[in-house]
């Protein structure tokens, strides 16, 4: 894999911005705040060895459950000189329901572990993850999911998402 100075510079910039956001916020926060919780998140994702980004929104239902939606798109490298857009093949939109263990396991307020199913345009999946909030607004997350089988997948590249592990990490913003 070839990396460039631009890639390293972007990673340093993102790390510096994350550090600045985290140090500028108070140190009292909840990673999951029940029915009062609304978050957006943005992060890096890797699905079966393909790199990409994900963005999502999550809303709390009660102290244990939340629901949300997320959009994932993976990098597509055109090795064969194809002119057609393959955006649909390398993108996925899904909805999910998460169970949060913060209350059950008596975890610190700024730390949460969650698990739940995902139904998307490409797959049916199960995810698990952790969140850590640095303040009332900003936090970080890490997530892993396994895409069990395809759902309504159409297109020319049917194997990008189904039956693959996906790993994600990024920032959360409480709204």
Q: Which residue stretches match the model-derived regions?
A:
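Solvent-exposed loop/turn segments connecting transmembrane beta-strands
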Residues: 42-53, 87-89, 116-127, 156-164
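Short loop/turn motifs that connect adjacent beta-strands in outer-membrane beta-barrel proteins
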Residues: 29-37, 63-64, 102-113, 136-138
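Membrane-embedded beta-strand positions of outer-membrane beta-barrel proteins
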Residues: 40-42, 69, 95-97, 113-117, ...
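Cleavable N-terminal export/targeting peptides
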Residues: 1-35, 175
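Flexible, solvent-exposed loop segments that connect beta-strands
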Residues: 31-40, 69-91, 111, 150-161
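Transmembrane beta-strands of outer-membrane beta-barrel pores
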Residues: 42-48, 71-77, 99-103, 117-123, ...
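Outer-membrane beta-barrel "beta-signal"
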Residues: 93-99, 162-175
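Short glycine/proline- and aromatic-enriched beta-strand/turn motifs that initiate or cap beta-hairpins
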Residues: 25-71, 172-174
